[in-house]
Amino acid sequence: MSNSRQHQGHFARKRFGQNFLVDHGVIDAIVAAIRPERGERMVEIGPGLGALTGPVIARLATPGSPLHAVELDRDLIGRLEQRFGELLELHAGDALTFDFGSIARPGGEPSLRIIGNLPYNISSPLLFHLMSFAPVVIDQHFMLQNEVVERMVAEPGTKAFSRLSVMLQYRYVMDKLIDVPPESFQPPPKVDSAIVRMIPHAPHELPAVDPAVLGEVVTAAFSQRRKMLRNTLGGYRDLVDFDALGFDLARRAEDIGVDEYVRVAQAVASARASG
């Protein structure tokens, strides 16, 4: 595979994190994992040159029910419009600020499926941005840097377990599906990639906790990974009786599961509410 940044007459732009998928075997495997069906409400993030877009449109789109796509590169938008016409509804803009809820069906029930080969340089902030739309999302299938996927699905007590693990596992059930080597792209990235499936927890499965408070607690815990929680969460001792909570502070952040972080966040929020 050539290392050239040019593919199909388009130069991949580093500032957009562009690496175009060209391996048809991988594309077929991704489409098989997504299983798009006619009439579904689906949006693709960063369609690029349309390698995944075309096969998905063939299974999903009709003139009255197009595939939606969010694309920042205006050069690509013109090419995509010319190629797919009314079967693709393009939204020109940055996925990091895009209102994905605007594409969901009215009523607030899960109706939206999100797919994409996410730009690796913005993957973590984009995943956090998408969390706010989880109530209207059926599922998400993303190509990501393998190291990010490993952190997303990591278990407590492992080196890969991180703030990203806790926050995403709180909101989604996630599975790593497919490993994708660098040579599947043009130009090849310097890292391995993987496909991950993310299914939001149903509302009745979600713990009653303020996500902002949970994020605050988890961020504090992981702020100094090698230090004990007595140091990183020590500032909450005025609010939380950790002994009464059965929470051992003589551990490190990566040793604590999602449920325990939720309990601490609930205690913090309760203490603040009671003044």
Swiss-Prot record:
Keywords: Cytoplasm, Methyltransferase, RNA-binding, rRNA processing, S-adenosyl-L-methionine, Transferase
Catalytic activity: adenosine(1518)/adenosine(1519) in 16S rRNA + 4 S-adenosyl-L-methionine = N(6)-dimethyladenosine(1518)/N(6)-dimethyladenosine(1519) in 16S rRNA + 4 S-adenosyl-L-homocysteine + 4 H(+)
Residues binding S-adenosyl-L-methionine: 19, 21, 46, 71, 94, 117
Transmembrane portions of the chain: none
Taxonomy, superkingdom: Bacteria
Alphabetical list of SMART domains matching this protein: rADc
Any single GO CC term annotated in Swiss-Prot or TrEMBL for this entry: cytosol
Subcellular location: Cytoplasm
InterPro entries in UniProt: KsgA/Erm, rRNA_Ade_diMease-like_C, rRNA_Ade_methylase_Trfase_N, rRNA_adenine_dimethylase, SAM-dependent_MTases_sf
NCBIfam families according to UniProt: ksgA
Family classification: Belongs to the class I-like SAM-binding methyltransferase superfamily. rRNA adenine N(6)-methyltransferase family. RsmA subfamily.
Function: Specifically dimethylates two adjacent adenosines (A1518 and A1519) in the loop of a conserved hairpin near the 3'-end of 16S rRNA in the 30S particle. May play a critical role in biogenesis of 30S subunits.
Name this protein carries in UniProt: Ribosomal RNA small subunit methyltransferase A
